[in-house]
Amino acid sequence: MSNVPLVEVKNLKKYFNTPSGTLHAVDGVNFTIDQGETLGVVGESGCGKSTLGRVILHLLDSTDGQIFFEGEDVTKVGRKKLTELRQNMQIVFQDPYASLDPRKTVSQIIAEPLIIQKKLSKTEIEERVKKIMDTVGLAKRVENSYPHELDGGRRQRIGI
């Protein structure tokens, strides 16, 4: 087992300029996640949880700080390498209803990241979607359902 942490965040900051001044959404966050560990980020609405996740995945640029994934500085890699790294990273949002596209079916939502990666054929994607649904305990009958037609537990499993 490697001594390199899975994720290491050092003095991470994300500020937004607003008409009323600077909003410090993420301010000096530090943590390490080792292989096999899980981190839950909790807090009140609007405290920066989602922003923190988006900055770690480099969906938003940080204002300052460093983010390492398996020893690689996410803030300094090129687009191709970042896409590769993101295949092993995920945010599970607290509210599965708000994080799922209401215009897409369950199978379309699950297939979307596989399509974006452009590594699998249509048939392979369909097979992978079936396997994923089985793995998280989603019955085949919900594959053509929309998020609003499912309970919170099923929506959460789609996000995962």
Where on the chain are the PLM-derived regions?
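Conserved ABC ATPase "signature" region
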Residues: 73, 123-141
